[in-house]
């Protein structure tokens, strides 16, 4: 008779679980990649954007300066962007700020994904896409910080609007729209588009219609009573201007992407789960790779050279401007203008001006301001 010691107990099989813990780790890894990528790109490649935008505006700590922004819807959003942009004289600060904003955007839209489509395989894909698209937009020197803050605010308000809550909670959220309109300006229309699309797919048209009723009343009151702003300001300010982009359709495609963002999430959920799981596995990596390729494709060394020249020119470093232009031979009109003025300041214009390119005749010696501005805008500073 065999003893109890001879009886072998069945061993438990070890299984690798892919539960909430692994998803949480995956999420934090993606956030770390977004932050690191943005910090690296804007610190080492697109840091000239910080110099340009910091010099473009003068922030003044005064009630008069603040009142100029507080007197119109969306003004405080631009004011906040201007305030934060004053630290752009330090490239590390600028890169850290941009990276933080992009990471916050990804976090907010990830939360939206989890509410709209809980358990979806694409919960990270669309959040990374939203952050990456705005990262690409920021490579334009005239695309400012408050533009990304506006999309962030629209996402936060939408997140609050679709959060689980009773009838009273939703009425309260709808009633807060005038305040949101005052803070975010025309980014309210992005939010209205998002909430309308979500209401349509979820068959909650009354909820979306309520926002449009409040929006219409708010618009009339702001136009006729409170702010007396022109329709163009109420309907578009402070959205990014299309004039700063070679292909103006890029801006409208950006707006449409965020407006139909909830619809994209819901449509993707109709895929077969086994197929979507396979597709979603590498989708985040593909988005990151595409973003990196497009940012480096849009990068121009001529832009870097031009703004380094401008930085030395504003610092009255005439020798530095002369040496840099003669070394790099930049053919941009503004670069040649800085070079010739520096030669004139050193008394060497007649003897040394042909040591560097002179492609524009007298234009590179005395350039009208409007031509100087248009030249800078057209010298590959814009997303093509």
Model regions: which residues?
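Hydrophobic cores of alpha-helical transmembrane segments in multi-pass inner/ER membrane proteins
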Residues: 2-3, 100-107, 151-163, 188-199, ...
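Internal/C-terminal transmembrane anchor helices
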Residues: 276-300
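Membrane-interface coil-to-helix junctions
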Residues: 40-96, 101
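Membrane-embedded alpha-helical segments of integral membrane proteins
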Residues: 205-272
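Membrane-interface micro-motifs in multi-pass membrane enzymes
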Residues: 55, 70-74, 94, 98, ...
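Membrane-interface segments at or immediately adjacent to transmembrane helices
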Residues: 296-370
């Amino acid at each position: 008779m065999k003893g109890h010691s001879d009886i072998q107990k069945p061993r438990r099989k070890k299984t690798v679980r892919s539960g909430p813990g692994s998803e949480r780790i995956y999420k934090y890894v993606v956030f770390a990649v977004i932050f690191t990528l943005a910090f690296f790109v804007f610190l080492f490649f697109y840091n000239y954007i910080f110099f340009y935008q910091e010099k473009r505006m003068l922030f003044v700590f005064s009630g008069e300066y603040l009142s100029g922004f507080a007197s119109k819807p969306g003004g405080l959003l631009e004011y906040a962007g201007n305030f934060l942009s004053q630290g752009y004289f330090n490239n590390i600060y600028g890169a850290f700020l941009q990276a933080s904003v992009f990471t916050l955007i990804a976090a907010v839209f990830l939360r939206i994904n989890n509410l709209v489509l809980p358990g979806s395989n694409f919960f990270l894909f669309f959040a990374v896409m939203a952050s990456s698209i705005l990262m690409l937009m920021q490579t334009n020197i005239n695309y400012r910080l408050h533009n990304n803050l506006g999309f962030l605010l629209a996402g936060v308000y939408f997140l609050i609007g679709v959060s689980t809550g009773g009838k009273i909670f939703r009425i309260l959220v709808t009633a807060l729209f005038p305040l949101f309109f005052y803070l975010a300006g025309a980014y309210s229309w992005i939010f209205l588009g998002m909430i309308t699309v979500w209401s349509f797919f979820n068959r909650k048209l009354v909820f979306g219609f309520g926002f449009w009723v409040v929006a219409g009343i708010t618009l009339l009151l702001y136009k006729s009573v409170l702010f007396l702003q022109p329709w163009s300001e109420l309907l578009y300010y402070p959205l990014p201007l299309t004039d700063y982009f070679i292909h103006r359709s890029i801006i409208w495609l950006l707006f449409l992407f965020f407006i139909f963002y909830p619809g994209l999430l819901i449509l993707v959920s109709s895929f077969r789960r086994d197929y979507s799981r396979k597709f979603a596995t590498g989708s985040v990596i593909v988005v990151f790779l595409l973003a990196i390729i497009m940012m480096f494709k849009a990068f121009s060394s001529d832009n870097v050279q031009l703004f380094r020249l401008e930085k030395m020119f504003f610092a009255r470093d005439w020798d530095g401007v002369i040496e840099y232009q003669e070394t790099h031979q930049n053919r941009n009109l503004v670069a040649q203008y800085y070079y010739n003025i520096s030669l004139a300041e050193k008394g060497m214009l007649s003897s040394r001006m042909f040591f560097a390119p002179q492609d524009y005749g007298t234009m590179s010696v005395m350039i009208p301001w409007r031509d100087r501005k248009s030249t800078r805008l057209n010298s590959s500073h814009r997303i093509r």
